[in-house]
């Protein structure tokens, strides 16, 4: 068996990626989220495939087809809620995965990090077009508002919006093309995730100490396969509790009414995992400025390898940077809360302050903290 595992062209790839892969001996539970993201992607592709068998992407029947899935299809309600809440699980794992990358300095693997940012953009795009598909009230207005942001692009903006809509508003053409995008994007994500892994295995994994671990590596199997399996088991337990007991807790009640172009919901807001970016978008009183800030809120991650000033890779032994990191986490939670609130005082000023803090901490404060740490340690 060992001979085939190491010699057969196909099993050799799997062997080098998941079995005989040399892994640092001290990576903690924060390193479990990569495999959990893989699990989420597989879950979403399979539940999505079964939903697509019964869904119709027509404005007249989209909402009814989702209702039909929940009422008439065997276990349709379960598949639908697993898919809807699976997106939330995906983003929870994604944000923790990125946070771990920032905390332990994993962004210094530039290729892996940049492909990760591309994966984040693609996942956000997939989640957005997917949210439009049930053609509920919040789906319709969310699609209208977010696609309309493109009209802020000078000169070609309005034409671009109408080109994406396939008409003069969100209609049948929009729904059909969004369904097509929603179906194809996860497979592109899966392909990119493989490339992400390929680049990671070129350098090997980072570890909590942020120091080379070449001297003490251990095989991935059985140590980390077991650990990943335990992580998956815990995540599935929490996930199924959410799906079976509180399936509609993370959704928007407005989405249980069919889309109506004549009736606007009181507060148009996206799903919870986009609220921080939505708050940054709304905190700038200019349309184009808001769109630029929205894109920069994610793109700023690409600058991290270039503004890393510390002589230590990880934040494990850098208390000032740790304080800033957790301040950033609190700031993002604050932005998430603000994104779900109406645009009125005092929320406007809180949102603007939190947005400014977000960029200040990442671009200025973290770079300065690294320099201070170097100075204090006389490095």
Swiss-Prot record:
- Bound cofactor: record note: Binds 2 heme b groups non-covalently.
Q: Which cofactor does it need?
A: heme b
Q: Where are the transmembrane segments?
A: 33-53, 77-98, 113-133, 178-198, 226-246, 288-308, 320-340, 347-367
Q: Record-annotated residues binding a ubiquinone? A: 201
Membrane topology, as annotated, equals: Multi-pass membrane protein
The record's section on Gene3D superfamilies has:
Cytochrome Bc1 Complex, Chain C (1.20.810.10)
- Which keywords label this protein? Electron transport, Heme, Iron, Membrane, Metal-binding, Mitochondrion, Mitochondrion inner membrane, Respiratory chain, Transmembrane, Transmembrane helix, Transport, Ubiquinone
Where is heme b b566 bound in this sequence? 97, 196
Assigned protein family: Belongs to the cytochrome b family.
- What does the subunit comment say? The cytochrome bc1 complex contains 11 subunits: 3 respiratory subunits (MT-CYB, CYC1 and UQCRFS1), 2 core proteins (UQCRC1 and UQCRC2) and 6 low-molecular weight proteins (UQCRH/QCR6, UQCRB/QCR7, UQCRQ/QCR8, UQCR10/QCR9, UQCR11/QCR10 and a cleavage product of UQCRFS1). This cytochrome bc1 complex then forms a dimer.
Q: What does this protein do?
A: Component of the ubiquinol-cytochrome c reductase complex (complex III or cytochrome b-c1 complex) that is part of the mitochondrial respiratory chain. The b-c1 complex mediates electron transfer from ubiquinol to cytochrome c. Contributes to the generation of a proton gradient across the mitochondrial membrane that is then used for ATP synthesis.
User: What is the official name of this protein in its record?
Assistant: Cytochrome b
Q: Which organism is it from?
A: Thomomys umbrinus
Origin organism lineage: Eukaryota, Metazoa, Chordata, Craniata, Vertebrata
Q: Which gene encodes it?
A: MT-CYB
